[in-house]
């Protein structure tokens, strides 16, 4: 009797194992069929599968692989999201995650463009404070520390590099660096962009129009020629009047012919 019960138990467990194997093989077969027959791809995708999403994006788009448990699902984007940078290849454009320490956004594998909150950006890296010889600006970037002089007086009012012959122009003033940065702070890949002269420009109005030097002689010559022309015109008008009066005083003799009978 015990042997019969044992045999029945073995048959039962073997049938259960066979059923589980059938279910697993059926699931694998359905998964293989779903990958072989491509479903309708999302926007911007050329080749895709139901299990892994997009496999190849259209040209000019980037593929981003998002992890979902043990799977990686591909999606197509026009630009990589924050924390990733784009790599363009002939076969496919990919979004690669930034791996620079304390970096939120990067331009390439070795250059960070935005650090985490409270940190300062310097030459593509993130620091808790700016290096010696540098100071922070309004965008949390370390720039060359540079002291500038006071503003110079406003320059003359000019237009097209001239100080005459106009009514309105521009004038400028500058302030220069008080000292040149040391080589230790100005050498390297990044230029000393913070230590440069500053220039301000404003509109100006000339109270009295100043003629240029050449314009005075030209104006005098023009006035002389105009006076000569006026004198010549007056003489010509006087001669014409005399000739008209002479013509009026001269009488032409008339000849009268009569008949004698």
From Swiss-Prot:
Residues 1-19 form the signal peptide. Residues 168-194, 212-261 are annotated as: Disordered. Keywords: Disulfide bond, Glycoprotein, Heparin-binding, Repeat, Secreted, Sensory transduction, Signal, Wnt signaling pathway. This is R-spondin-1. It comes from Danio rerio (Zebrafish). It is found in: Secreted. Coiled coil: none annotated. GO terms for molecular function: heparin binding; signaling receptor binding.
């Amino acid at each position: 009797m015990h042997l019969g019960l044992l045999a029945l138990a073995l048959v039962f467990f073997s049938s259960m194992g066979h059923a589980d194997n059938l279910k697993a093989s059926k699931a694998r077969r359905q998964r293989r069929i779903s990958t072989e027959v491509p479903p309708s791809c999302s926007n911007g995708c050329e080749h895709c599968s139901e299990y892994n999403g997009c496999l190849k994006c259209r040209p000019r788009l980037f593929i981003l692989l998002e992890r979902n448990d043990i799977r990686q699902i591909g999606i197509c984007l026009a630009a990589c999201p924050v924390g990733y940078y784009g790599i363009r290849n002939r076969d496919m454009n990919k979004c690669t995650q930034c791996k620079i320490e304390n970096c939120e956004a990067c331009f390439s594998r070795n250059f960070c463009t935005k650090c985490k909150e409270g940190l300062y950006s310097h030459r593509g890296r993130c620091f808790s404070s700016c290096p010696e010889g540098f100071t922070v600006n309004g965008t949390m970037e370390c720039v060359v520390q540079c002291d500038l002089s006071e503003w110079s007086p406003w320059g003359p009012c000019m237009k097209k590099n001239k100080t005459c012959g106009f009514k309105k122009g521009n004038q400028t003033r500058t302030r220069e660096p008080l000292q040149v940065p040391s080589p230790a702070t100005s050498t390297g890949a990044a230029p000393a962009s913070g230590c440069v002269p500053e220039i301000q420009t404003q509109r100006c109005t000339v109270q009295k129009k100043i003629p240029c030097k050449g314009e005075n002689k030209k104006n005098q010559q023009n006035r002389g020629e105009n006076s000569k022309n006026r004198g010549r015109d007056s003489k010509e008008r006087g001669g014409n009047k005399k000739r008209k009066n002479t013509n009026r005083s001269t009488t032409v003799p008339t000849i009268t012919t009569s008949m004698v009978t």
